[in-house]
């Protein structure tokens, strides 16, 4: 099955050498930067190379509806872009919310990391509000009968951590409720996967409406990704909601997908942004895309070596190479021709803060051959 991979910090197409090249005929390719030695060199065949398209966004979620692609991304009231193909041309057409999020915390004007799904004739856009480096966060949801701008209803709070109603319940007492990913199986059961740093990535079941958690969160919550030993030092922030006493665990950006007969849990590991080009993190400490798989959407998920993701496991799918630096923030779009894994990255040597503008990149493979 085709796997197309989209990266962030420019929209590019990444192509595996073992398959025919994806056609970019008729599309204008942006000028590539002058090649300079990569800080973390990889063998030429370690990862696919990239080609750029015309979409510049950050933290997108992409769906395909009746011949049109819709991208939802971080920005004022959650930006919407539309295009006739992944190549583009992409056009910004509006926003999901017609006002600030109704959740009274975090960055209400520009919610983070949205994910949009279609279920039972309704479009659901899940989003997060927070402040960088703190876990006083919340996940909300808006719904609409159409995927484009206009007609969305902000239902507000789904779950939250740090402060507020429900934040004193497990697992919200130790987790950070951002980076929502919702998966709905063929049986209609929905699952919310979320988390960033702190106690890692968690999952709770949703009720039939997808607007509330089903059952008791304390007993139904599953920790899916974690590492016992923190690779980064503890924060000294005076606010207890903004520090991790036992050290930082750079795990976030989960996404759950299904490729028969396996469920795949993708996540980002490492430093995502705010890079100092004169003092980059040691190789392997910057963002990379990792994955595990399971026969159940509830896990446990293991990597190719059989290591549980909840115990430090994770198969590296894509990492820094060529002009790609710190790829992550991934999601999966399922097409008739195959699966599309999209993500963001910084283009080397122009490594800069990822805020709103970033590049979208895609690569192509005939199978999930990273597991072979």
From Swiss-Prot:
Its EC number is 3.2.1.99. Glycans are attached at residues 120, 363. Residues 1-16 form the signal peptide. One of its GO terms (molecular function) is arabinan endo-1,5-alpha-L-arabinosidase activity. GO terms for biological process: arabinan catabolic process; xylan catabolic process. The active site is at residues 59, 252. GO terms for cellular component: extracellular region. It is found in: Secreted. InterPro entries: GH43_arabinanases, Glyco_hydro_43, Glyco_hydro_43_endo_a_Ara-ase, Glyco_hydro_beta-prop_sf. Residues 23-34 have a biased composition (Low complexity). Residues 23-52 are annotated as: Disordered. Pathway: Glycan metabolism; L-arabinan degradation. It comes from the Eukaryota. The keyword Glycoprotein applies. It catalyses: Endohydrolysis of (1->5)-alpha-arabinofuranosidic linkages in (1->5)-arabinans. It holds the Pfam family Glyco_hydro_43. Keywords: Carbohydrate metabolism, Glycoprotein, Glycosidase, Hydrolase, Polysaccharide degradation, Secreted, Signal, Xylan degradation. The record marks 179 as: Important for catalytic activity, responsible for pKa modulation of the active site Glu and correct orientation of both the proton donor and substrate. Endo-1,5-alpha-L-arabinanase involved in degradation of pectin. Its preferred substrate is linear 1,5-alpha-L-arabinan. This is Probable arabinan endo-1,5-alpha-L-arabinosidase B. It comes from Aspergillus fumigatus (strain ATCC MYA-4609 / CBS 101355 / FGSC A1100 / Af293) (Neosartorya fumigata). The lineage of its organism: Eukaryota, Fungi, Dikarya, Ascomycota, Pezizomycotina.
């Amino acid at each position: 099955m085709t796997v197309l991979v989209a990266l962030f910090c420019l929209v590019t197409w990444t192509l595996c050498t073992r398959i025919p090249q994806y056609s970019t005929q008729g599309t204008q390719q942006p000028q590539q930067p002058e090649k300079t030695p990569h800080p973390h060199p990889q063998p030429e065949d370690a990862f696919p190379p990239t080609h750029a398209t015309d979409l510049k966004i950050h933290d997108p979620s992409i769906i395909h509806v009746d011949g049109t692609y819709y991208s939802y991304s971080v920005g004022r009231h959650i930006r919407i872009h539309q295009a006739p193909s992944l190549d583009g041309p992409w056009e910004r057409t509006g926003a999901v919310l017609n006002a600030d999020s109704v959740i009274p915390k975090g960055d209400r004007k520009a919610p983070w990391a949205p994910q949009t799904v279609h279920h039972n004739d309704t479009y659901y856009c899940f989003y997060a509000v927070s402040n960088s480096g703190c876990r006083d966060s919340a996940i909300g949801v808006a719904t609409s009968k159409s995927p484009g701008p206009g007609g969305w209803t902000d239902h507000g709070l789904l779950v939250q951590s740090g402060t507020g109603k429900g934040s004193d319940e497990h697992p919200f007492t130790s987790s950070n409720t951002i980076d929502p990913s919702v998966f709905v199986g063929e049986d209609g059961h929905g699952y919310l996967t979320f988390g960033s740093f702190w106690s890692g990535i968690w999952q709770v079941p949703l009720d039939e409406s997808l607007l509330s958690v089903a059952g008791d969160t304390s007993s139904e919550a599953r920790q899916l990704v974690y590492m016992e030993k923190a690779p980064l030092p503890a924060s000294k922030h005076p606010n207890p909601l903004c520090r991790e006493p036992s050290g930082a665990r750079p795990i976030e950006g989960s996404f759950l997908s299904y490729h028969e007969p396996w469920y795949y849990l993708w996540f980002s590991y490492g430093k995502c942004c705010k890079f100092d080009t004169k003092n980059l993190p040691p190789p392997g400490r910057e963002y990379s895309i990792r994955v595990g798989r399971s026969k159940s959407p509830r896990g446990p998920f293991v990597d190719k070596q059989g290591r549980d993701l909840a115990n430090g496991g994770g198969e590296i799918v894509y990492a820094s190479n060529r002009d790609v630096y710190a790829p992550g923030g991934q999601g999966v779009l399922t097409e008739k021709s195959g699966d599309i894994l999209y993500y963001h990255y910084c283009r080397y040597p122009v490594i800069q803060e990822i805020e709103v503008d970033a590049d979208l990149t895609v690569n192509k493979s005939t199978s999930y051959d990273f597991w072979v």
